């Protein structure tokens, strides 16, 4: 007896992560499972003025015309340089707050309703000596945080998103209450490629866990990155560290400096969201501080957009 194949699950959401240098998309079913994925080197910096709708149609137009009811876009597509500015949503913010501040795109060529997710903004809490607060922002990471909340079921705690600009977010009752940004990845790139240290560092050297751990430990000494970074040069100068290990040592220094600034307590529980390479390094560093880690990867973005879609009444925008 022949059994008919199961019908294909219909897509319920076209989810896009449109960043500075890349464009990723996924078709999700009603449960948030990924039906198909695509990626292009078409970040917002590659799109000419007025060209976003054309790039969208060339990249995902066939998906948009299959009957999927909604497209949600996170990332830099909502910046001033993007498709349409989606102003930052103030913290504390949860799913409903983001859903209420979506930027809906009006364009005759679009086959389905398209909305851009706003980023988040907050004000620094610690004002020493009466200094005014300093604003902080994120755009794209908020979706990863809410995806991690949905994926882990944790509605309270600290969520860490390593990257060029790492984010540490405090989540309370399922809402982002406060966060801090650290320019860790950017500082590593500047020091390793455009400073005195670039003469010593081998950019393509393999990861050295021992050298990385030594850098994290040195950062904990409290001397500060401005002093410790110069040690990368002198360790090479006096041949106390092999050249292939220097990049890992410097990586440990800058990540360790980020952790030192957070004053982590032993046993701290953190949710870590990011690429496998960065999650591995931060896990190594955080273990030296006695932290306990729950890690997630790229699936957090799709989980966040799917969860956000459940809070949207998009029929008013069709």
Regions found by a protein language model. Name each.
Residues 218-259:
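Adenine-nucleotide phosphate-binding core of ATP-dependent small-molecule kinases
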Residues 63-135, 173:
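Short beta-strand-loop/turn "lid" adjacent to the catalytic site in phosphate-handling enzymes
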Residues 47, 121-218:
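Glycine-rich phosphate-binding loop plus the immediately following alpha-helix
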Residues 13-17, 70-74, 157-161, 271:
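Short glycine-aspartate micro-motif
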Residues 294-318:
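Glycine-rich phosphate-binding/hydrolytic loop that grips phosphoryl groups
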Residues 12-51:
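Short glycine-rich, Thr/Ser-proximal phosphate-binding strand/loop in the N-terminal lobe
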Residues 22, 267-285:
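Glycine-rich phosphate-binding loops at beta-strand->alpha-helix junctions
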Residues 58-70, 259-267:
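Phosphate/pyrophosphate-binding loops at sites that engage ATP/ADP/AMP, CoA/4′-phosphopantetheine
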């Amino acid at each position: 007896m022949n059994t008919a194949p199961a019908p294909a699950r219909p897509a319920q959401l076209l989810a896009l992560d449109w960043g500075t240098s890349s464009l990723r998309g996924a078709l999700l079913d009603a449960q948030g499972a990924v039906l198909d994925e695509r990626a292009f080197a078409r970040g917002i910096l590659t799109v000419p003025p007025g060209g976003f709708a054309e790039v969208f149609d060339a990249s995902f137009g066939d998906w948009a015309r299959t009957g999927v009811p909604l497209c949600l876009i996170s990332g830099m597509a909502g910046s001033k340089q993007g498709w349409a500015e989606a102003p930052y949503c103030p913290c504390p913010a949860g799913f409903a707050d983001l859903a209420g501040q979506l930027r809906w795109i009006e364009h005759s060529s679009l086959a389905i309703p398209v909305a851009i997710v706003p980023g988040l903004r907050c004000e620094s809490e610690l004002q020493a000596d009466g200094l005014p607060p300093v604003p902080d922002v994120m755009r794209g990471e908020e979706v990863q945080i809410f995806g991690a909340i949905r994926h882990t079921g944790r509605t309270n705690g600290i969520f860490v998103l390593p990257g060029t600009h790492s984010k540490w977010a405090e989540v309370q009752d399922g809402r982002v209450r406060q966060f801090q940004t650290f320019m860790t990845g950017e500082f590593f790139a500047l020091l390793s490629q455009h400073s005195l240290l670039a003469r010593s560092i081998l950019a393509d050297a393999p990861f050295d866990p021992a050298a990385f751990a030594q850098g994290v430990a040195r950062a904990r000494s409290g001397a500060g990155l401005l002093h410790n970074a110069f040690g990368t040069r002198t360790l090479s100068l006096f041949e106390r560290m092999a050249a292939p290990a220097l990049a890992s040592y410097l990586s440990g220094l800058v990540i360790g400096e980020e952790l030192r600034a957070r004053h982590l307590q032993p046993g701290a529980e953190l949710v870590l969201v990011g690429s496998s390479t960065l999650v591995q390094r931060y896990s190594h560093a955080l273990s030296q501080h006695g932290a306990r880690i729950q890690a997630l990867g790229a699936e957090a973005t799709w989980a966040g957009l799917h969860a956000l879609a459940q809070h949207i009444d998009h029929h008013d925008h069709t």
